[in-house]
């Protein structure tokens, strides 16, 4: 865990702002074969969630990219270039750093409601960071670009990410929250995100999904 490191992004560059990388595993330059998970944050902790999943086909996806709204905030480690990122839900510890991904022209996937609520959450994060005096790794231009990067999906509808098939399942938790099913040539993965197995007036409960991992 690194602390006390601050990199302010000059115009036209993509450096991350880091007060702390949180609990993470370094992204390797040469990864072994098989399905690999690399946590950019959120390992053994709550908040600043981010995880790269990839396999030998070269397909990879970033699951969530958030920040922990502590004082000072906790940010995840800098993400490698990714074409696709899937957001489970619109809480800031899961989507708070997603606007920074516009540096990589990353497509954002999630439910329609998560995409809609993200504008409110990102605008509020920007406002609070200004009031509290903590710089962000992204600015209003990134926020606007991120809103254009969304590709929303209905629950239980397949979409492709490289060589993989993915679909979203209700997760409970909050309206629009989703579990992510990923079918790879080697295994079926389920990323639960934050779940609730109880029905509520606003969100259907999470139910079991058959998977290998």
PLM features: residue spans?
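Short, basic/polar N-terminal leader/transit segment immediately after the initiator methionine
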Residues: 18-20
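Short, Lys/Arg-enriched N-terminal segments with co-localized hydrophobic residues
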Residues: 8-15
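His/Asp/Glu-rich metal-coordinating catalytic cores
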Residues: 22, 27-45, 50-86, 91-95, ...
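Short, positively charged low-complexity motifs
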Residues: 2-7
């Amino acid at each position: 865990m690194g602390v006390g490191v601050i990199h302010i992004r000059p115009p036209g560059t993509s450096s991350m702002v880091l007060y702390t990388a949180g609990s993470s595993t370094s992204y390797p330059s040469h990864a072994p074969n098989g399905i690999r998970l690399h946590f950019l944050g959120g390992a053994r902790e709550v908040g600043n969630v981010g995880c790269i999943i990839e396999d030998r086909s070269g397909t990879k996806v970033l699951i969530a990219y958030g920040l922990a709204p502590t004082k000072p905030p906790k940010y995840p480690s800098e993400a490698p270039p990714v074409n696709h990122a899937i957001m489970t839900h619109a809480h800031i510890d899961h989507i708070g750093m997603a606007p920074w991904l516009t540096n990589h022209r990353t497509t954002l996937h999630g439910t329609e409601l998560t995409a809609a609520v993200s504008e409110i959450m990102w605008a509020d994060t920007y406002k609070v960071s200004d009031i509290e005096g903590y710089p962000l790794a992204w600015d209003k231009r990134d926020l606007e670009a991120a809103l254009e990067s969304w590709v929303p999906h209905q629950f239980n509808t397949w979409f492709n990410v490289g060589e993989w098939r993915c679909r979203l399942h209700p997760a409970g938790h909050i309206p629009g929250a989703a579990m992510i099913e990923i079918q790879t040539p080697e295994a079926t993965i389920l990323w639960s995100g934050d779940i609730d197995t109880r029905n509520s007036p606003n969100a259907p409960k999470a139910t079991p999904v058959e998977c290998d991992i």
